[in-house]
Amino acid sequence: MLRATARVDISSSDGLVELGRDQIDLAIRGGRQPQDRVVARRLDDNRFLLAASPQYLAQHGRPRTLADLLQHKALLYRGPHALIRWQGRDEEGWRELAVPPAFISNDGASLIAMACQHRGLVLLPEWGLRPYLQRGELEALELEQPVSVNR
């Protein structure tokens, strides 16, 4: 429970912060373990899933391979410094996938909303997609080869 004298100031950003220096007491981040001098606790798995609405899949087909993805529309995330590109791993290793974007945003909720409106495929952390998968608004896609994002 929050004390009546406590002040909460929330900043939602993908930018990295320096705890203390930036007057930040608590940060929630996704990705790699931070420096040793930071106390970190794992909140959830950060595994990325490829997903789409059942209606999108009925209209455009279900991709099975990396090559199939190129015939679909991507809903891409823009990080603080660059577009977060999709990558696939084949027998030659990891390579960037040139899936044509239909929508680009730096807001995961906007990407999920577009996926739920049948606009394309989204590749986001499972924890963000979980409620939509559980309600059947989105379906997780398993390809023959692994897909992830460049970070």
Mark where each language-model region is:
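C-terminal regulatory
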Residues: 17-21, 33-151
